Swiss-Prot record:
One of its GO terms (molecular function) is argininosuccinate lyase activity. The keyword Cytoplasm applies. This is Argininosuccinate lyase. GO terms for cellular component: cytosol. The lineage of its organism: Bacteria, Pseudomonadati, Myxococcota, Myxococcia, Myxococcales. It comes from Anaeromyxobacter sp. (strain K). It catalyses: 2-(N(omega)-L-arginino)succinate = fumarate + L-arginine. Gene3D superfamilies: Fumarase/aspartase (C-terminal domain), Fumarase/aspartase (Central domain), Fumarase/aspartase (N-terminal domain).
């Protein structure tokens, strides 16, 4: 596109002279909203096609505009559009290049439309696409976890609370917890998409237009479910943007949790997992290092996602109806947040699906028996002892075990009987971790049958998603 810095912006038609360069510098948004060129052009093509159908613009002119906008889109995609700060934003860049291609016919395009409803539409179209991209990335992530879970149905390890060994679980059950988390994230993106997929075009600057637009036809052309119902709200509503960034932030927090576990589990101290070399880095100084940067970056990206959400909410806070220029500042967090999530999710998926999990080391971590103390308490409950009484008895046994320097699993039946009269010889069976899991078959529990049922449920769900 030819530079034309002396061109007067369309928004200054009633103003004398040129804008102060300092205001121009403050106002420029093309470096951010330039990423919306495809959505902007798509909305313009639907709008001008409707104008022609309504007899507001000549059909031949509309056809030339639609064809020229295809060319403008291709030029943007090829990097041939040189951004001119004097044109401020993506809308003006598109309109100016269109004018160079079709001449005065370009002037038809903006009939019945304001920048306010135009940018609101662009953002909604972006949000719909972003939700689809995030959903696809999270599905890939779920598949990575599901594949490892299927391979490790029989691998057992300590489950943790407060990062202390708590009770035994299977590795499959542990990994399926992340499949659940990312499933909820996908539901949130679907909800955001549903609310975003309506058209604000026809709302004008704030009060619609006197032209006989067909708003529903535009929405249908764009694949949207309907139209907004209040023009004041439509041009100033950024709820879907905030909801999208919340969904991104929560998914990023979930990614930070597996990121932390990848960091911990790959330490020599834990030794539960080894990352593929393809998903690890070295050190510029220490030649022996193999660093879990993928997990650390996943943790760090959560901070950025939270910051994007808070930044947008702060921009929206206290804005009177309807449109205010503050809303220009929503582009940077909105446009960057979903793409950062997709990048992080794909990297974590690759790390998980190529990781090696060390079953022997995980089972070794259960060896001292304290992770099965709850089973000993429930042994008494099965024999009619109130739980609090049983809890106290096993607590005394745990304290004795610590003083004696012997694992609870190595205490004798006679010693157990000193802590409660209802302990008998078979109490020692409580310290068989695999037996413990077999006794935990409630829906959602880590028992083998319960876990297999969840594996089948998720395989069916993700199979349908792929189909």
């Amino acid at each position: 596109m030819r530079a034309n810095s002396k061109a007067k912006p369309v928004s200054r038609a009633a103003l004398a002279g040129e804008a102060d360069p300092r205001l121009v510098a403050l106002s420029v948004s093309i470096q951010d909203d330039g990423a919306l060129y495809a959505e902007d052009i798509r909305g313009s093509q639907a709008h001008v096609s409707m104008l022609a159908a309504q007899g507001i613009v000549p059909k031949a002119a509309a056809r030339r505009i639609v064809a020229a906008l295809d060319q403008v889109r291709a030029e943007f995609a090829a990097g041939k559009i040189r951004f001119d700060p004097a044109l401020e934003d993506v809308h003006t860049h598109v309109e100016r290049r269109l004018g160079e291609l079709v001449g005065k016919d370009a002037g038809y395009l903006h009939a019945g439309r304001s920048r306010n409803d135009q940018v609101a539409l662009d953002e909604r179209l972006f949000i719909v696409g972003a939700c689809d991209r995030c959903d696809a990335a999270l599905e890939r992530l779920q598949r990575a976890f599901l594949g490892q879970a299927r391979a490790h149905e029989r691998t057992i390890l300590p489950g943790y609370t407060h990062l202390q060994r708590a009770q035994p679980v299977s590795l499959a059950h542990h990994l399926l917890a992340y499949v659940e988390m990312f499933g909820r994230d996908r539901e949130r993106f679907a909800e955001v998409r549903r609310r975003a997929a309506i058209s604000p075009l026809g709302s004008g600057a704030l009060a619609g237009t006197t032209l006989p637009l067909d708003r529903e036809a535009v929405a249908a052309r764009l694949g949207l479910a309907g139209v907004t119902h209040n023009s004041l709200d439509a041009v100033s509503d950024r709820d879907s943007a905030a909801e999208l960034l919340f969904a991104c932030a929560l998914a990023a927090v979930h990614l930070s949790r597996i990121g932390e576990e990848l960091v911990l589990w790959t330490t020599k101290e834990f030794g539960f997992a080894t990352l593929s070399d393809a998903f690890a880095t070295g050190s510029s100084l220490m030649p022996q290092k193999k660093n879990p940067d993928v997990g650390e970056l996943a943790r760090g990206r959560a901070g950025r996602a939270l910051g994007d959400l808070v930044a947008l909410l702060a921009i929206l806070k206290g804005l009177p109806l309807s449109y205010n220029r503050d809303l220009q500042e929503d582009k940077r967090p909105l446009l960057g947040g979903p793409e950062a999530l997709v990048l992080t999710a794909d990297a974590v998926a690759g790390a998980v699906e190529t990781a090696t999990f060390h079953a022997a080391r995980m089972e070794e971590a259960l060896g001292s028996g304290e992770a099965l103390a709850t089973d000993a308490a429930e042994y008494l409950v099965d024999r009619g002892v109130p739980f609090r009484e049983a809890h106290e008895a096993v607590g005394k046994a745990a304290a004795f075990s610590a003083r004696e320097g012997r694992p609870m699993a190595r205490l004798t039946a006679a010693e157990w009987a000193t802590f409660h009269r209802r302990f008998e010889k078979d109490v020692l069976r409580c310290f068989d971790a695999r037996r413990s899991l077999r006794r935990r078959e409630l829906p959602g529990a880590p028992g083998p049958r319960a876990v297999r049922a969840e594996l089948r449920r998720w395989e069916k769900a993700l199979g349908k998603a792929r189909g």
